[in-house]
Structure formats: structure tokens, C-alpha cells
Amino acid sequence: MAINIVAQNKKARHDYEILEKFEAGIVLSGAEVKALRAKRANLSDAFCRFIKGELYLMNAHIAHLETANKYFTPDTRAPRKLLLHKKELEKLYVKVHKDGLTIVPLMIYFNERNYAKVSIAIAKGKKLHDKRADMKAKTLDREAKTAMKNRSY
């Protein structure tokens, strides 16, 4: 059984250079898990932050399902705690505070055991000229592939 991707942060790959990836668990309520199974999540403006030595996913939108809980409307952009091993947390803390890097969520998915997981990465912000160079390389690669595809023998 493969992983079931719920939401991806495509903006992160465009705005940041990904250095190292991690897999983290996430603390959710039952209604939020139900919303994730319905693929009602968005990571476009999400980021990670340390609060009192723990890592939290901030500004990630997980929609409220009307069928899940009728009498309580949770905050859809509430901070959600990420679950990592202590050594991983220490490594991330050092990278963020000493090296000036950022932690970016890449995607939310359900793994083989049907647990909700968040793929996070240590990333370095790209400058405008880096983004332009990446776009130019992608267009050149795309043009080369189409030229090879359309080439007749």
C-alpha cells in the first residue's frame, strides 16, 4: 500500500532550496483527521516554529467538516504540534537558530499504517536570480525533451 498524499506545498520548492527532509507525526483531533481523509487541507502559507522547545506547524489550513462535529467549530489555522524524536528536534533547533535556516512543511500524507504524517524540510531561501536560473533550466530541459520526442529518424 502506498502513501496517500493529502496536501502539498508546491510554493516551498519554488521559494526554498531543500537541504534535508524529515518525517513528523502530527497531533490532530478526530474531526481534523476526517477532514484530512476528505483532502480538505492547504499548506500554501504554512511554516514551522519552535515554541517552548517543541515544534509546531503554523498557519496550515485544515477545513472544518460539517458532518464531523456540528456543535463545535474549531480554528482551521490553529497551531498543531509536530511529533519528532528528541535528537531530531535538537538538530532542527540548532540548524534554525545557529545557521539561520528555516523549516518548511512539504506535504501532509497518510503512511502505510494510515497515520497522518507531515513531511518537513530544512530549507534555505532562494534569491530572485536563483529562481530565474531554476526556471530557465526547467524550460531548457522541457524543450530538449520535446525536441527528442518530435525527432524523426
Swiss-Prot record:
It comes from the Bacteria. The gene is smpB. The lineage of its organism: Bacteria, Pseudomonadati, Campylobacterota, Epsilonproteobacteria, Campylobacterales. This is SsrA-binding protein. GO terms for biological process: trans-translation. SUPFAM superfamilies: Small protein B (SmpB) (SSF74982). GO terms for cellular component: cytosol. CDD domains: SmpB. Its main location: cytoplasm. Keywords: Cytoplasm, RNA-binding.
